[in-house]
């Protein structure tokens, strides 16, 4: 269930990005290169803006709802397994107990 919602979440995010990029801007008319500014488009002169605005609003709502559901599902996972890094104090104690004292090496080249 989590993987299906995650897949839908990614698809909605990509679709939302696409619909926002295709919309006609106020100044630059970036959407006109994709047919958003022409009057003879598939949706008519005013229909494309209305369709793109509604679809973007629906996709944005779905994006936030799915994000909340995924966050809720992720926070309520009951079977949390103990990981390797959960209890590092035991490993530190073992390392301290196994440490050997340093030998005095009189023939060493390192000054003391």
UniProtKB/Swiss-Prot annotation:
One of its GO terms (molecular function) is protein-transporting ATPase activity. Residues 92-102 have a biased composition (Low complexity). The keyword Transport applies. It comes from the Bacteria. The chain crosses the membrane at residues 2-22, 51-71. Its main location: membrane. GO terms for biological process: intracellular protein transmembrane transport; protein secretion; protein transport by the Sec complex. Residues 103-112 have a biased composition (Basic and acidic residues). GO terms for cellular component: plasma membrane. Belongs to the SecG family. Involved in protein export. Participates in an early event of protein translocation. This is Protein-export membrane protein SecG.
